[in-house]
Amino acid sequence: MKQAVIVDCIRTPMGRSKAGVFRNVRAETLSAELMKALLIRNPQLDPSLIEDVIWGCVQQTLEQGFNIARNASLLAGIPKTAGAVTVNRLCGSSMDAIHQAARAIMTGMGDTFIIGGVEHMGHVPMNHGVDFHPGLANRVAKASGMMGLTAEMLGKMHGISREQQDAFAVRSHQRAHAATVEGRFAKEIWAMEGHDANGALIKVMHDEVIRPETTMESLAGLRPVFDPANGTVTAGTSSALSDGASAMLVMEESKARALGLPIRARIRSMAVAGCDAAIMGYGPVPATQKALARAGLTVADLDVIELNEAFAAQSLPCVKDLGLQDVVEEKINLNGGAIALGHPLGCSGARISTTLINLMEEKDATIGLATMCIGLGQGIATVFERV
């Protein structure tokens, strides 16, 4: 079977969804600029070799509708001979794009793919036009479509306290701020045009969403937002609403080597798994277990881990049940996570994978895991191996 590898991976800065730096920039533009950037950064690659553009996006309507993958690839000047498809596995969409490209490569159905994802949550709100089937309540808990309440349920089931959640959120902001100040995001961020608070055109080079001033004291003053009477989950311990895109160049290994392109990581294994929709945030546990089994590995073999921080109340039970409580500081979300950076839904899978690969290089690590929960009860996981 052929081997799929990551040749390059980048992302936009993360912009705030409310009056943020990308308020006048469309989702197609964020996407197209990254597609162009991959070609600029890898001049050995003839664009005519691209088999397909596979792009994750959850809210496929308004500017993100009508196959945003194709719209963005045409904007980017990708040859018209390349295909383009938009995929939707909710929060796991752009990680699913990685998996789709890898499966195609492994089965000989192409050797060069641009993948990624986008979500402009400022322009297309996450609940825009959502209309659940009334009969769904006969199969799953009525609150299963309300992500914050599923986090509340998972946190209660695992005894996660408000203080534990607040501490996890503070860590996320502190780590992300330190990564910014120390230049550790520089290799993964592709600067984009945006607008400052006064409307002036600027080059955006850093994430806008991080709040370095976050403390236990400031978070303690926030009220529970999803279950005001009995809850513990606040806006401060939930992933921020943000606008952003991420992208990767995924190739068949021998093809990349023949072109003299760098190989930053191999895709060692992949998995998706389902769980109860009422505790959708638990999905990373079965997905990770499945991916590790397919790779012949255990959690002890993992050097670096990116676990998408949808909610602190969701992340901490996953850490616990994967047996990772003792290695959080050494291995998990070392540059912060979605609580600090935001979770632009269709973007996040390739975003956390990009951050992971850069961390693996920085730490000289061999095996890394990127995993995330998915609304309505799924998880997705990818094991990467540095060459």
From Swiss-Prot:
Pfam families in the record: Thiolase_C, Thiolase_N
Q: Where in the cell is it found?
A: Cytoplasm
Assigned GO CC terms:
cytoplasm
The protein's annotated catalytic reaction(s) are: an acyl-CoA + acetyl-CoA = a 3-oxoacyl-CoA + CoA
Question: Annotated Gene Ontology MF terms?
Answer: acetyl-CoA C-acyltransferase activity
Give the main location.
Answer: cytoplasm
Q: Which residues form the active site?
A: 91, 343, 373
Q: Which SUPFAM superfamilies match?
A: Thiolase-like
InterPro entries tied to this protein: FadA, Thiolase, Thiolase-like, Thiolase-like_sf_Thiolase, Thiolase_acyl_enz_int_AS, Thiolase_AS, Thiolase_C, Thiolase_CS
The EC number on file is: 2.3.1.16
Function recorded in the entry: Catalyzes the final step of fatty acid oxidation in which acetyl-CoA is released and the CoA ester of a fatty acid two carbons shorter is formed.
Query: Self-association or partners: how does it assemble?
Result: Heterotetramer of two alpha chains (FadB) and two beta chains (FadA).
Family designation: Belongs to the thiolase-like superfamily. Thiolase family.
Listed name of the protein? 3-ketoacyl-CoA thiolase
Q: What organism is the protein native to?
A: Shewanella denitrificans (strain OS217 / ATCC BAA-1090 / DSM 15013)
Q: What is the lineage of its organism?
A: Bacteria, Pseudomonadati, Pseudomonadota, Gammaproteobacteria, Alteromonadales
